[in-house]
From Swiss-Prot:
Optimum pH is 8.0. [2Fe-2S] cluster binds at residues 59, 127, 200. Belongs to the IlvD/Edd family. Homotetramer. The keyword Lipoprotein does not apply. GO terms for biological process: arabinose catabolic process. Its EC number is 4.2.1.25, 4.2.1.67, 4.2.1.6. Catalyzes the dehydration of L-arabinonate to 2-dehydro-3-deoxy-L-arabinonate during L-arabinose degradation. Can also dehydrate D-galactonate and D-fuconate with good catalytic efficiency. Has weak activity with D-xylonate and D-gluconate. Its cofactor is [2Fe-2S] cluster; Mg(2+). This is L-arabinonate dehydratase. Gene3D superfamilies: IlvD/EDD C-terminal domain-like. The lineage of its organism: Bacteria, Pseudomonadati, Pseudomonadota, Alphaproteobacteria, Hyphomicrobiales. Pathway: Carbohydrate metabolism.
């Protein structure tokens, strides 16, 4: 007789599958129609593989194949894998913006975990919002969970030069406007940008969030950088499947891994890799689900003295494929540890500390992962700006900015929203030059709605034709992690709720002082108060559907832009019987 699987405790899936009651036979019997033999319901852990595959999410188009490797690992370790499709918010498809649906996806994931017979979860993610949304949902349930990402695309090349996902889209688009590239050449370049399955091959938001998951300890060491089509990505998926079974046995939960120390490690990692500004709102939101007190002040404090040592676009010149060959994120974590910038005893999903995982790794290419003395910037952390224009903060990515613009005073050229910007920006009669500061309103969490990636406003053609490639830009929007420029983002409070950004007028003088973390509208306190008292909202107001729910309940960018009723951990208690 085959020995029954033994586990140190009764698992929650046995509330559905264990015993001989009518309801158990109902749950168990119907699942058997998929050909599962009776002994699979003997108490072994049921592992939910939460898969964000979708034909509409091309970055995640290969996740079905990876899910099979995860299943193989779960079977090998004595678990029972069941794949569950979950909400997949594609960054390049969803309108008005995938960010508006991050919280909806997190809610759907949370309920999918809590409401079904899972003992542990594998979070199979890739595209930008899929990683934070699944981490948020899993954190709110606090079942053993582990991340495996789909990995980046292979390098792109156009006429012998590297082409970075997104980064060169913005660059080539500006070249067309400046008359330096023909439309035909732009179309030719399109074929070089996405030449394999996977996420953006730059250090955009997808690769940043894969790195954040690894730095938080929520993915196996080395996961972040393996290319999507590399055979080692499949191996990583299979090893992840094996590991989650042991995590269930050990009852190793997200709340034990995603501690304040882990978040500080992730913030410093983001600085070292030149990561996306989007990591700010995502980590704030994830921390809010775990119950960790994380703020913009933590971002500024932890990232201020961390050099950017990863030489990847958009900050540097290489791509994720080279980063993987150089040793990937473990090398970066080791460098942080050697510099005293890592909480070495932070726990990871492996059951080992982060330092035990990375202390012996080797940097195979010091032009890709740079020595500190050759860093792209000596202070690479996301800058948190404050002042009368951003009382609750705004952010800027120094590694992607122009050094000569980090201290700048200029005349405001104001766009009331994205439509106003699009209507005016190509007009040669627009009163603007390279010394001006472009200001866009009503693009925040409530205003857009959803906080779209429109903050990196394209420059006016008449400025581009002068060879000018950057100007100071300020908004309450986000920007793509693949983008670059001296761009002030996430200005809080946003314009749509009557923040000071809402009352900036054409011709106002604005001062940006990055070294002193200052963003100042050069008008008197009395004039600012008068304008704010007279302000009236002029953004769209949805009256029904999810857009209405989102706009009513979304919080500000300074706290992570989560829905107010979703913050915190609600646990994984089994609900009442369904029949």
């Amino acid at each position: 007789m085959k020995k029954k699987a033994e586990w140190p405790r009764k698992l929650r899936s046995q509330e559905w599958y264990g015993g001989t009651s009518r309801d158990v036979i109902y749950h168990r019997g119907w699942l058997k129609n998929q050909g599962y033999p009776h002994d699979l319901f003997d108490g072994r852990p049921v592992i939910g593989i939460l898969n964000t595959w979708s034909d509409m999410t091309p970055c995640n188009g290969h996740l079905r194949e990876l899910a099979e490797k995860v299943k193989a690992g779960v079977w090998e370790a004595g678990g029972f894998p069941l794949e569950v499709p979950v909400f997949s918010a594609s960054e390049n498809t969803f309108r008005p913006t995938a960010m508006m649906y991050r919280n909806l996806a997190a809610l759907a994931v949370e309920e999918a975990i809590r409401g079904q017979p899972m003992d542990g979860c594998v979070l199979l993610v890739g595209c930008d919002k899929t990683t934070p949304s699944l981490l948020m949902g899993a954190a709110s349930c606090d079942l053993p969970s582990i991340v495996v990402t789909g990995g980046p695309m292979l390098n792109g090349y156009f006429r012998g030069e590297r082409v970075g996902s997104g980064t060169h889209l913005w660059k080539f688009s500006e070249m067309v406007k400046a008359g330096e590239m023909t439309q035909a050449e732009f179309l030719e370049a399109e074929a070089s940008m996405s030449r394999s399955s996977g996420t953006c091959n730059t250090m955009g938001t997808a690769s940043t969030m894969a790195s954040m998951a690894e730095a938080l300890g929520m993915a196996l060491s080395g996961n972040a950088a393996i290319p999507g089509v590399d055979s080692r990505r499949k191996v990583m998926a299979q090893l992840t499947g094996r590991r989650i079974v042991q995590m269930v046995k050990d009852d190793l939960k997200p709340s034990e891994i995603m501690t304040k120390q882990a978040f500080e490690n992730a913030i410093r990692t983001n600085a070292a890799i030149g990561g996306s500004t989007n990591a700010v709102i995502h980590l704030l939101a994830i921390a809010g689900r775990v119950g960790i007190d994380l703020s913009l002040d933590d971002w500024d404090r932890c990232g201020r003295d961390v050099p950017t040592i990863v030489n990847l676009m958009p900050s540097g010149k290489y791509l994720m494929e080279e980063f993987f060959y150089a040793g990937g994120l473990p090398v970066v974590l080791k460098r942080l540890g050697e510099a005293g910038l890592l909480h070495k005893d932070a726990l990871t999903v492996s059951g080992e500390t982060v330092w035990d995982e990375v202390k012996d790794v080797v940097n195979w290419n010091e032009d890709v992962i740079l020595p500190a003395e050759k860093a792209l910037t000596s202070s690479g952390g996301i800058v948190v700006l404050r002042g009368n224009l951003a009382p609750k903060g705004a952010v800027l990515k120094p590694s992607a900015a122009s050094p000569h613009l980090l201290v700048h005073k200029g005349r405001a050229v104001v766009f009331e929203d994205i439509d106003d910007y699009k209507a005016k920006i190509n007009d040669d009669n627009l009163d603007i030059d390279e010394n001006c500061i472009m200001v866009m309103k009503n693009c925040g969490p409530k205003g857009y709605p959803g906080m779209a990636e429109v903050g990196n406003m394209g420059l006016p053609p008449k400025v581009l034709k002068k060879g000018i490639l950057d100007m100071v830009r300020i908004s309450d929007a986000r920007m793509s992690g693949t983008a670059y420029g001296t761009v002030v983002l996430h200005t809080s409070p946003e314009a749509a709720v009557g923040g000071p950004l809402a009352v900036v007028k054409n011709g106002d003088m604005i001062e940006l002082d990055v070294p002193n973390r200052r963003l100042h509208l050069d008008i008197s306190d009395e004039e600012l108060a008068r304008r704010l008292a007279e302000w009236q909202p002029n953004h769209d107001l949805p009256t029904s559907g999810y857009a209405f729910l989102h706009q009513q309940h979304v919080e500000g960018a300074d706290t992570g832009a989560d829905l107010d009723f979703l913050k915190g951990c609600r646990g994984n208690a089994v609900g009442k019987d369904s029949h």
